[in-house]
């Protein structure tokens, strides 16, 4: 059994892929939580704190690279970060933010095999045109034609090698201030293109648009949301609406951003570190999370073994 598999949930002991596990979470009772991560450390922390699934956020990975969330980081660069996540949190389903797929169906369809080989559970594509802009910045969010994006989703499903791999279609219709009817039309078209799930995005300060969408949705595919701007409702509130997956998309990165900025300001102002020591994680906690102790045990096992007699030949 490899790092992307675990014993099956049916009691047979057959391995369950991370993609199949993500599907089970999205089709199971309640609302699955996906914690936004951007590198191996953030993934390890999220899993250690009990999150069952992870969201490899395009915004957060781009920010970690020091560039804007406007397709400035290449797919290859983002996959490098995804690899650190799956290595740091083996067995945890990682849904990768694939942005627009970096072009048309032909540039997008290699996307499922690449993250799948890295141990990711799935990839999510949005129906903006390439290059995209982050959904929370500006108003110039142009969408691809429905048929064109549906073809992109179908091409990706036809290309995937692992039958359990998840392809999620994300519509930005509400972000683009289009009517609810357009969001529903796009959602139904993407399900017909065999998307495994739908990500419905909104940037209102309340969940009103999401609630209205769910009232009209026929339940033909699980719905995921990212309540970044409508942050007051709880997970139970979203479960009552019938939401399958809730993505806490960027809060680890934003927390790290604030903490790093504040510590830098304090050290520069104090001309020393005496004012920040109580605000930063003890090295002992970091060593514990990354399991330094097992390395020490392995060193004792492999470097202090008795010398073996040379082979005579």
UniProtKB/Swiss-Prot annotation:
- List S-S links within the chain: none
> GO:BP terms for this protein?
antibiotic biosynthetic process
Catalysed reaction per UniProt? Answer: phosphoenolpyruvate + H(+) = 3-phosphonopyruvate
Q: Where is the active site?
A: 69 (nucleophile)
Name the SUPFAM superfamilies for this protein: Phosphoenolpyruvate/pyruvate domain
Q: Which family does it belong to?
A: Belongs to the isocitrate lyase/PEP mutase superfamily. PEP mutase family.
Pathway membership: Secondary metabolite biosynthesis; bialaphos biosynthesis
Q: Which top class of enzyme applies to this chain?
A: isomerase
Q: Which GO terms describe its molecular function?
A: phosphoenolpyruvate mutase activity
Chain intervals for the UniProt region annotation (Disordered):
1-23
Q: What is the protein's given name?
A: Phosphoenolpyruvate phosphomutase
Name its species: Streptomyces viridochromogenes (strain DSM 40736 / JCM 4977 / BCRC 1201 / Tue 494)
Key words, A-Z: Antibiotic biosynthesis, Isomerase
Described purpose of this protein according to its UniProt entry: Formation of a carbon-phosphorus bond by converting phosphoenolpyruvate (PEP) to phosphonopyruvate (P-Pyr).
